[in-house]
Every structure is written in structure tokens, then in C-alpha cells.
A protein has these predicted regions:
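HIT superfamily nucleotide-processing domains
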Residues: 1-135
Length: 135
């Protein structure tokens, strides 16, 4: 997303000079599931410079707090894997009281098309996150 200019469902919810945060591409199993990607091309977390590293945790915390306050999540996960896409990105994933066990914790990363939420629901969640992150 940072380099390709592809618009995923929900679009961009936050951006600055260092990072861009956007709704997880389809199939999105949980409304408010966000990817945070570095603007600068780096392979992994270990390649972030000092400024990027110092900015990442506060940004993730803001997103997780917005997932709780704006969407009603009762918890939020952070995953950094880097196996399939050779560009730094983090998964910031809300968990809701009614999130099924098969989508809790790391299992959410194995979601299938059958788990996809309606695009309208994903879009609405991203707009709510975007508004919360502007406050």
C-alpha cells in the first residue's frame, strides 16, 4: 500500500511522513483490522531507523485505543511477521466480545473467505477509526 497506491476496503485511516495505516485487504475477518506500513521501504522491524522505531509504538497504541473506544473492541492484538511481503508492516487487530474462538489471537491470520465481513461494515469501521485518530 505504501508504494503501490492500491485502495483497500476502508482506505487510509492514518498517515504521516513515516507510516500509513489502512484497512486490511479482503477478505477482512474483523472490522477495524488495520495494517500499519512504513513509508520507507525496509524489510523488517529490525530495519526501522531510530525515528521510525520511536514513532511506531505510540502510533500502534493510538490505533488500539481507537479500536476500543470507537469500535467497542475489548482487546487488540499486534502482529509483525514479514514472511510473505518483503516490506515492513504490522497487523493491528481488534478483538470483540463476540469474536469467535477461531479468529482470536494468531488464528485470525488464518481467516478464510468464509470469515470475510461485508465491505460496508469494514468501510464503516475504518471511517470510525479515522475520525477517532483525528481527535
Amino acid at each position: 500500500m505504501a508504494a503501490r497506491r492500491v485502495r483497500p476496503p476502508g482506505g487510509v485511516v492514518f498517515e504521516d511522513d513515516l507510516f500509513v495505516a489502512y484497512g486490511f485487504p479482503e477478505p477482512n475477518p474483523l472490522p477495524g483490522y488495520v495494517i500499519v506500513a512504513s513509508r520507507r521501504h525496509v524489510r523488517g522491524l529490525y530495519d526501522l531507523d531510530a525515528e521510525e522505531a520511536a514513532a511506531l509504538a505510540p502510533l500502534v497504541i493510538r490505533i488500539q485505543r481507537a479500536q476500543k473506544s470507537a469500535l467497542g473492541a475489548d482487546h487488540a492484538y499486534l502482529f509483525v511477521i514479514g514472511d510473505r511481503i518483503p516490506h515492513f508492516h504490522a497487523h493491528v487487530v481488534p478483538r470483540f466480545p463476540d469474536t469467535p474462538p477461531r479468529l482470536r489471537g494468531g488464528r485470525v491470520l488464518q481467516a478464510t473467505e468464509a470469515d470475510a465481513r461485508p465491505v460496508e461494515e469494514v468501510e464503516a469501521a475504518c471511517r470510525a477509526l479515522e475520525a477517532a485518530l483525528r481527535r
